[in-house]
């Protein structure tokens, strides 16, 4: 069974669940049978860009990918706010105020660092057991609570009289549509997102991404290894812990390793180049927090 990551450059109009379905279909057509597949963070259908898709044992890392920071390029069109905060919605507010380049740059520091943000009514958040977007589509008033997010970096890429394109590096839980709405309001006008592209999700950037056409070649017989990144590609942000054969055997059994000299923290334990587990190291003791069942081809 294949284990690892396919990084899809998701095209516009394709939902994240549909993207997972496309991977499953191509794997099935390539003769791999039933493979566990999951994605590392929902991307709106109208958005494009990096969508990490995990196969096999890599699906155990989807939670980490959901928690990872993301980087986006987005364009906000000034003068109209829509109910969805993007191109799909109907206009609910309008303004003739068009901010200058200096105005835009002057407000960006207010949206850098920890901020409070109200998510869009058209979002996948749960409200009384239902998706917020389902309630909004029924015409119900959706009131979502403000939440704390962090904007690590926000910079202006380009601008004209009607719109501005920005780059944002953000924490998990950040809604770019809400960020665009709030920037426009801070400028004394209104706005909505007309372009959204994810440039990076955790360790994966566009340089690792493949097109849907490239993915479809797998279903027609192209080698999967040409598009599949190894499981450990999703672990580059944490240090590796090299194990002896005896230690590797203990980790496979879920036993605690003791007397280790490394600093406290999260590590990925490996035997040779084979990832065995995520381990939490505290005061010299390493405990398995998530094990991987991979073949010992490189041990």
Per-segment meaning from a language model:
Residues 1-32, 36-46, 186-299:
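Accessory RNA 3′-end/elbow-binding domains used by RNA modification enzymes
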Residues 1-172, 176-210:
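Catalytic cores of RNA-modifying enzymes
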């Amino acid at each position: 069974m294949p284990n690892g990551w396919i990084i899809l450059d998701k095209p516009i109009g394709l939902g994240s669940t549909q993207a997972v379905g496309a991977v499953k279909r191509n794997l099935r057509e390539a003769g791999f049978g039933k493979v566990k597949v999951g994605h590392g963070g929902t991307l709106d259908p109208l958005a494009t860009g990096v969508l990490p898709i995990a196969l096999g044992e890599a699906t155990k890392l989807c939670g980490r990918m959901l928690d990872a920071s993301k980087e986006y390029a987005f364009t906000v069109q000034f003068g109209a706010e829509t109910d969805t905060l993007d191109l799909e919605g109907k206009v609910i507010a309008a303004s003739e105020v068009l901010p200058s380049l200096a105005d835009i740059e002057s407000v960006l520091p207010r949206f850098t660092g920890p901020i409070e943000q109200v998510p869009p009514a058209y979002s996948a958040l749960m409200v009384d057991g239902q998706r917020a977007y389902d309630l909004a589509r029924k015409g119900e008033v959706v009131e979502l609570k403000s939440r704390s997010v962090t904007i690590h970096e926000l910079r202006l890429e380009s601008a004209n009289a009607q719109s501005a394109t920005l780059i944002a590096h953000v924490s998990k839980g950040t809604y770019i549509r809400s960020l665009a709405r709030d920037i426009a309001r801070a400028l004394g006008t209104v706005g909505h997102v007309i372009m959204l592209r994810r440039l990076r999700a955790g360790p994966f950037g566009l340089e690792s991404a493949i097109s849907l056409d490239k993915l479809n070649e797998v279903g027609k017989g192209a080698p999967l290894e040409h598009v599949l990144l190894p499981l450990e590609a999703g672990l580059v942000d944490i240090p590796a812990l090299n194990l002896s054969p005896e230690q590797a055997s203990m980790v496979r059994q879920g036993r605690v390793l003791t007397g280790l000299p490394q600093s406290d923290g999260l590590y990925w334990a490996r035997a040779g180049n084979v990832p065995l587990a995520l381990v939490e190291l505290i005061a010299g003791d390493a405990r398995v927090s998530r094990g991987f069942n991979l073949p010992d081809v490189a041990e």
